[in-house]
Amino acid sequence: MLQMLIAAPNSGSGKTTVTIALLAALKARGLNPCAFKSGPDYIDPMFHRSVLGVESHNLDLFFSKPQIVQNLYNKSAADHGAAICEGAMGYYDGLGGTSDIASAWHLADTLNLPVLLVLRPKGASLTLAAQVRGLMSFRTPHHIAGIILNDCKENLYRILAPVLEKETGVPVIGYLPPMPKAAIESRHLGLKTAGEIENLQKKITLLHETMKKTVDFEKLFSVFACPAPKVPKEEFPIPNVRIAVASCLLYTSPSPRD
């Protein structure tokens, strides 16, 4: 089973772009992928849902104990061929920005997930390798298993990929080139919601079609193949209860888990 957490050194690197492109590609391959988001974020799961047609799941180590998060992940990922979790902010950015608690790394460590690191090579080349090595040495284990370059031209990728692999020992599985027509607009609170973006499905299709040409999927499957998670037993079965939840443009923040 393909499993990973997609992370980056900082926000704005393209985690959501890579995530939705990969979800679309895996769906097209018939793997029936499921999606997760680190923390309570409600915007990114909207994009996951736009790709998959089903709800994404929030995994929050602030509001939930590690075992509850593990059980939710295992139960939700069961019967799927791939499980893709999107991290939040920078890889180690947790509570208050001064702790790794509830960070993307904390989630990867809790679930023992391999991490696909998204790098955006704007104004940097060899320094990217130093950045990766710094991330790898900051905590043990670091869980970083692969690298993908986002917003990277092909000729630059051909130069950077072998250098990054040589200097870090981490395989580079591909890249996404600059794609203005597939851009997901942002605002002061982060990305716009999926419902606010015009031609979103066309953008998803463009990302998917591009990724098919620029990512080595054989390498991806080799690096991120993991044993399927075991479905937890219900210790305290709860009877089915029907609950109504409001959802509209003005009220979009509750996650399905809430």
Roles of regions detected by a PLM:
Residues 115-118, 173-175:
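Short hydrophobic alpha-helical runs that function as membrane-insertion/retention elements
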Residues 126-232:
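Internal gly/pro-rich beta-alpha loop/helix module
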Residues 1, 236-241:
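A short, charged/proline- and glycine-enriched loop
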Residues 34, 242-244:
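Conserved beta-strand elements of the Class I
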Residues 2-17, 23-111, 119-146, 151-158:
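ATP-dependent carboxylate-amine ligase catalytic core
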Residues 251-258:
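Conserved small/polar residues in nucleotide/adenosyl-binding loops
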Residues 22, 26-27, 164, 257:
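Hydrophobic alpha-helical packing residues
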